[in-house]
Every structure is written in structure tokens, then in C-alpha cells.
Amino acid sequence: MKNLKIKSRKTRLVFPLCVVLLSLLTICCNDELKVDKETFFPPKADEESRFDIFYPDSGGFGTKLILKGYNFGTDTNYIKVTVNDKKAKVIRANDNIIYAIVPSRADTGYVRLYLKKGEEFEEFTSETEFRYLFKSNVSTLFGVPGKAAEDNRLDGPYAEALLRRPWQIVTDNDGTIYFVDEGRGQSKNGALRKASNGNVETLVYDNNGVFQSPNGVVFSLNEDTLFIPNRWTGSDVKTDVNIVFSTRDANFVNTKALVTIPKAGTNSVAVHPKTGEVFFDHNSEGAVYRHTGNGNYEKMLVVREGYNDMEMRLLFNKTGDILYIIARKKHCIYKVAYNAATHTFGIPELFAGDYGESGYASGKGTGARFNQPSTPCLDPEGNLLIPDKMNHCIRKITPEGEVTLYAGQPQKSGHTDGLPDKAKFYEPEAVTFSGNALIVADRGNHCVRNVVIE
């Protein structure tokens, strides 16, 4: 008979499987979990506590997790439970049983119990891991896969709207999606569009004013302004404005010049998450600039001396002390420290991938390989999610630089919905996180995808 082992800081006990099953039968009795409000009490400080078993051994978000042992007390203020170091909500306790809820995105890991006795917590750790089961799916949100808008874009319901080349994408706190449908020139080739409540709407077309070559889109800190880099090209763009802005009070249909630098080739704008400062790249110089107000700007750093035309994408981490610089055409990601108090950057260092080396490989730091990584976003845990454009997939990079596959089949293009590791993308260009889903501008498929990985 197979035994189940659970360890605590003070004890290590071996329980036959029959005892586990008997315990579970006992747990099923409703009366066992009933606690009179008047009998709430902490674990007894002068008695030893035990954490014997937990059940079930696997599950997803919302799974009812039961811990059994001795001297837990009944006051949940003295009890803390974690799954893979993520806090689980403790619902109730009856001194021998704790009832908790598995948190979202816990991943596989040990169950830990903390009991407060006096001023300190006693810690108990399970011998076996709880196996987390993710709920995952990739679906098409809007656009008609494989069908591009040839001339004028078609607005309308999600299932009927036609996109040309969804290029950059962002969501506001209400879940409304704003995206740039790529195009250059003055004759409606590019556009700023909006998707909400099941409908796609075009807000601004390319014109003979300042909005001629939209190449990105990002919100101001309070989400009342959209900043749009205007990419200069010698043939069909006749304005020197390299950053355009549009305001919510005008329903984002107005476009005005924010910064004018001739032939800058700006690809990206980043907004500092604490100060609201606006930063942008100068592709012709391989540099990052800061907007200082009233159309003024200052040069902050050069990513790699003597090198330019990287087609940068910029994004701060959640605390604003690190700027990620995606060198798309050089197949790598840099990071650089930023001091918001002094408005100064450190020295850029290679974070993931290797400069000028394309390919596909998971791994840590410079051991990973990309093929045109593009516009990223952060997930709720602060990981970098990034479309690996010419590898036709989405990658995940932890703050420590560990690179793994997030969704898609590496180096296999196409359009397939379903499980993340079975789904196919075609040159995904940009991502943004909204609620519990990753929104993907699937450029080559002329549509926007929804990736739910709990």
C-alpha cells in the first residue's frame, strides 16, 4: 500500500492511504465544518500543531482545498495558506480542518500552512506538490481570418469587420480596444480603430495632416490621451511630426502634433507608470528620447554606440525602474535602469536573445533566440509577454530573463484556435493584457485574437 508523506517544521508523519480516505469521508460531513461564531479561537500556543494531509492533489482556480491536521484553531485571522507561495483564501477552520480556495495562476508547487502563535507564525510545508491545472484557450475576437480589407476598411460586428494589418493595440480600464491598422501615406491607407461591445469602428484615417503613418498606440497615465508614433518614410509620408496625440474628450477622432523631429523614424512610445513621462525612440540614431513638454525633448541614451535602425519597442516594468527596449530587427531585448527622481538612465544591458542572432530557442538571457520580437506588454505578475513575429508565436520572459513559450506553435504559421500549444498565429505584431486575457494583433491573419491562460 502506497503511503503519503507530509512534513511540518516539527514533525514528519506517515499516513496509510486508508487513513486518508477515512479522513476525506469525515470531511464530507457537513457538521464537521460548522463552527459556532462564539467559539472562534486561535491555535493553542502551548500545544503542538500538525499539518497531516491536503486534498485534492490537483485542480485549477477556485478548487476547494482541504487541509487536515491538529490544533489549527477556528479563527481564520490566525491562519494563512499558500499554494506555490500564492495566497489562498481561507474560508473556515474547525481546529482539525482548514477549508481554502486555490488562487488563480498558482502553478504547481507546495502547499504551505502558517499558524500564528503569539507574535510569530509557525510554518508547515507539504511533502508533495499541488498540481495546478490551467484553463487555457485561444480564440478569434474580431476580424475575418485570412481576409484583408483591400481598400476601405469594413466597420461593423466583430465577425464581419475587415482589418488590413492590425499593427499595435492597447486597452483601457473599461476593456475597450484601440488599435492601429497599419498603413502609410495620405489616402486612408492606415487608421486608428476602436473595438467595443461587439463592434469595430474606424476613428481616424491617414490624411494630409499630421496623421500619416501610425506605427503604435499607447495611453497616457490617466487614459485621457493616446500617443501615436508617426513613422517617417521617404516615399509616402510628407510630415515631420513623429508623435501624434489624440484625446478622449474628442472621442479620439482629433489628431495633433506632440513632437516634431524630421526623419526620426519613431516606432514606439512608452509612458512611465508612476510619473506619466513620455519616452520615444529615434530609429535613425538608435536612441531613446524624453518629451519634456511643449514639443520639447531631450536625448536620454543610445542603446548601442554606432548602431541604429533597430526598430525599437519600449515598455517600462510595473515600478518604472526598468525600461525594456525591444530591438526588433536585431532579434533581442535590452533592459536599462531608470531613476525617475533624477531623470537618468543607467547603461543598457542585453536581457534576452543575442544581438543580430535570429532563431528560436527557450532558455535564460542570451541563451534564448527570437526572430523579430515586437511590441510587448506585462502580465499581472510583471512578466514580459512578447510576440515573436517571424516565429509566429507568443513568448514569456520573467523578470529574471527566463524565456518560455506562451502560446502558438514556434515557426509554424497559420490560423488555428484552441489550446495555446496547438493554436497557430501568422506574424503576430503586438499584445496587450486585459482582464484575464491576452489580446493579440495577429497581423498576418488580419484579425485580433484572444488568449486566455489562467
Feature roles, as predicted:
Residues 116, 182-184, 229-233, 274, ...:
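Short loop/turn segments immediately following the C-termini of beta-strands
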Residues 244-250, 336-344, 452-454:
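Short loop/turn segments immediately following beta-strands, especially the blade-tip
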Residues 176-179, 225-229, 277-281, 322-325, ...:
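Conserved beta-propeller blade signature
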Residues 188-194, 238-245, 286-290, 331-335, ...:
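A short loop-to-beta-strand structural motif that recurs across blades of beta-propeller domains
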Residues 67, 134-167, 183-184, 199-215, ...:
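Gly/Pro-rich loop segments of beta-rich domains
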Residues 171-174, 219-223, 271-275, 316-320, ...:
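Residue-level detector of Asp-centered blade-edge/turn motifs that repeat once per structural unit
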Residues 426-454:
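Blade-level signature of beta-propeller repeat domains, shared across WD40, Kelch, NHL, RCC1
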Residues 29-140, 176, 251, 344:
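Ser/Thr/Pro-rich low-complexity tracts
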